[in-house]
Amino acid sequence: MKNSDKPAATTSDIHQEETPQVCSYEGSDYQEVFWDTGERRYEDAVEEVALKRLMPKHGKLLLELGAGAGRNTPRYAGWERIVLLDYSRTQLLQARERLGDSSRYVYVTADIYKLPFVSGLFDGATMIRTLHHLSDANTALTNVRRVLGEEAVFILEFANKRNLKAIARYLLGKQKWSPFTKEQVEFVALNYNFHPKTVRKLLKENQFLLKKQITVSHFRINVLKRRVKHELLVALDSLFQHTGSIIQLSPSVFTKSITSGRSSRSEDDAFFACPICDTSLPEARENQTCPGCGHVWAYEDGIYEFRINPES
């Protein structure tokens, strides 16, 4: 096709090109296969221990980034309201089925690189098993910081590039990439491992003050999970989590940070912000036409649709 024959790019097309590719779980049986079968019972249990240690017991408005089917949401029982955000609509439909239509929960499909909220809205945020899928971690964290208020808590989990298994494989010549270099490694398409120092640097550059880091899933080895009693393995991991303040050699690392610096906050009662033009929008449980750009944002099946180009 000649350039003159190409249709003009729409506003949505332009914004879509500006954002990095996302890893979508649309239509996936991830929750059922990965978690509900019990195969990852150990990982689920030790992550619960980590969250109990890091999360404030009480809070007002929490943003759960990469919420998926709501596996972790019940663990934030002390928070008054929780916004479950995921790129996959089908995952959020599962979350809604599990959690219900309580006014305590707000379900939002959106791109983490284009968060549809006014600045300084949230008192806290979690990002568990999500940074793992982000090619541009810096842009994502910049967006997260924008929507958080002053002294807000941020719980971030990341897949650790410098874990014992990766170190052993590298030293034995069974792995090409080095676990000691600072750049993130993409071992499968849109699946990334990060060096702990790189994550700490990104947090600092985006006005997050690191308060605590703990290591998780030290015994993520199939033979151990099969042969060692589940409760014992979880108890051992719980003990080893404290070593994260000294060194991080586990496959998963949890961090707790507090926002630093000033946070801008919308003067009106707006909740959402148009991902295309940033115009403030109310929290209305109905379709909304943005007064700034005219884009219609849908509300269907209890889910707010804020993906610029939603999947068919």
Protein language model regions, located:
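Class I SAM-dependent methyltransferase SAM/SAH-binding core
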Residues: 63, 67-114
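Short catalytic micro-motifs in class I SAM-dependent methyltransferases
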Residues: 129-133
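Acceptor-substrate binding/catalytic loop of class I
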Residues: 177-198
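A short glycine-rich, Lys/Arg-flanked "PGG" loop and its adjoining helix->strand segment in the class I
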Residues: 138-153
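A C-terminal cap/extension of S-adenosyl-L-methionine-dependent methyltransferases
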Residues: 173-176, 201, 212-280
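A conserved beta-strand element that flanks and buttresses the S-adenosyl-L-methionine
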Residues: 126
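Conserved class I S-adenosyl-L-methionine
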Residues: 2-58, 91, 153-179, 308-312
